[in-house]
Amino acid sequence: MTTREEALAFGLSYPDTCQDAPFHDTNWQLVRIKSSKKVFLWTYEKDGYINLNVKADPEWRDYWRSAFVSVTAGYHLNKEHWSTIILDGTVPDDAIKNMIDESYRMVTDSPTKRIYEAVKKIPKGKDRKSVV
């Protein structure tokens, strides 16, 4: 993956996603979840390279940053939760896709949503007796 178009296309391949340019600056393009408006992939050009910002679990964040020189603390974002991937050809496509996938999963997974879905599955029987 070496172009913004490839990164955006991969991000847009996930369900319920859309592309946006929030700063009225075509250099900053992002992919967000339509329903929640949460962003999981930022793209921009800096120093002659396309950069991607992705959300990362702290354990994986440290792994990715130590494994690749071109994965750094998130530019213009919370350094603890976001990483920047510089598309200079040194990070393999599968690693980039894994990081984008992790970012998507982090913004779509919510404990509240999991609890709500679990509660909806609890059977509602006709023989339920009220407790007095």
Where are these regions (language model features)?
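Charge-dense, helix-prone N-terminal extensions
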Residues: 1-132
